[in-house]
């Protein structure tokens, strides 16, 4: 996946997909009552990114729905997966379940159109804090109680805090999650980060008893770092410049081994060579 970073305004969806992104990452901030409120990153900003664009969350979802509904004038066939970077650090730990419930209601209504020909993209709920794992259970309970448990087929998970792989595995056990797991690793593009933990995550993904289905690395804006990440075997790279990632994927060394994922690829299935 060529993942566009900090896509928080509806107009940016077109912009990033047109540059080659087949996936976007969107920041979600919450109010004091754990309602998802804005798609907004805010300062401090990464280097080279635009961090002050925003929409109301529900309005962004409507724009995203149009971009991922076949037949809509705004439809992009290429856009197959959306990562919601859930900014739950503003919440108390005991609000995580509520945040999940409210997030599910927002998505059900504004993105999935109450189960009636809504947006088709796969969704990854990315949570920064292992202590907030009940966001997942709250989300699942709500879709089930609202009569749409089948939509969980479209939902995956990520803990984005660069925690020990073993601790993440334990947390998924607590949350009752047995699949659909993406593992992110990374740091703001202003700083350098080695690939040690990425290699551990890839090893877990490729082992017979690992919990990880896919690994993505963030935030990469340089060709050299892109090559290093691909050499380490990642499934996705998050970037402010999707055209840079697309260019590297077109280099002869990578063309033979990697291709841009399409909607027919299963994002919850580990790719076997």
Swiss-Prot record:
Its cofactor is Mg(2+). Expressed by the venom gland. GO terms for biological process: killing of cells of another organism; lipid catabolic process. It holds the Pfam family GDPD_2. Disulfide bonds join 45-51, 47-190. Its EC number is 4.6.1.-. Its main location: secreted. It is an enzyme of class 4 (lyase). Keywords: Cytolysis, Dermonecrotic toxin, Disulfide bond, Glycoprotein, Hemolysis, Lipid degradation, Lipid metabolism, Lyase, Magnesium, Metal-binding, Secreted, Toxin. GO terms for molecular function: lyase activity; metal ion binding; phosphoric diester hydrolase activity; toxin activity. Mg(2+) binds at residues 25, 27, 85. It is found in: Secreted. GO terms for cellular component: extracellular region. Binds 1 Mg(2+) ion per subunit. The active site is at residues 5, 41. Glycans are attached at residue 250. InterPro entries: PLC-like_Pdiesterase_TIM-brl. This is Dermonecrotic toxin LdSicTox-alphaIB1bi. It comes from Loxosceles deserta. The lineage of its organism: Eukaryota, Metazoa, Ecdysozoa, Arthropoda, Chelicerata.
């Amino acid at each position: 996946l060529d993942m566009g970073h900090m896509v928080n305004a509806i107009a940016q969806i077109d912009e990033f997909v047109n540059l080659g992104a087949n996936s976007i990452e969107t920041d979600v901030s919450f109010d004091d009552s754990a309602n998802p409120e804005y798609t907004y990153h805010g300062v401090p900003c990464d280097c080279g990114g635009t961090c002050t664009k925003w929409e109301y969350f529900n309005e962004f979802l409507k724009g995203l729905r149009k971009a991922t509904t076949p037949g809509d004038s705004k439809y992009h066939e290429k856009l197959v997966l959306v990562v919601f970077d859930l900014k739950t650090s503003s919440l108390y730990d005991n609000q995580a379940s509520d945040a999940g419930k409210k997030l599910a209601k927002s998505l059900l209504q504004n993105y999935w159109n109450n189960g009636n020909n809504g947006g088709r993209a796969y969704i990854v709920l990315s949570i920064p804090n292992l202590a907030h794992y009940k966001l997942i259970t709250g989300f699942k309970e709500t879709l089930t109680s609202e009569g749409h448990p089948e939509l969980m087929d479209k939902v995956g998970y990520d803990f984005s805090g660069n925690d020990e792989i073993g601790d993440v595995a334990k947390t998924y056990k607590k949350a009752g999650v047995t699949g659909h797991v993406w593992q992110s690793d990374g740091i703001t593009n202003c700083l350098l980060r080695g690939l040690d933990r990425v290699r551990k995550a890839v090893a877990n993904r490729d082992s017979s008893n690992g919990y990880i289905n896919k690994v993505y690395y963030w935030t990469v804006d340089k060709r050299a770092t892109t090559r290093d990440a691909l050499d380490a075997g990642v499934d996705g790279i998050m970037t402010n410049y999707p055209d840079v990632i697309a260019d590297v994927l077109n280099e002869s060394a990578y063309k033979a081994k990697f291709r841009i994922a399409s909607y027919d690829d299963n994002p919850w299935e580990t790719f076997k060579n």
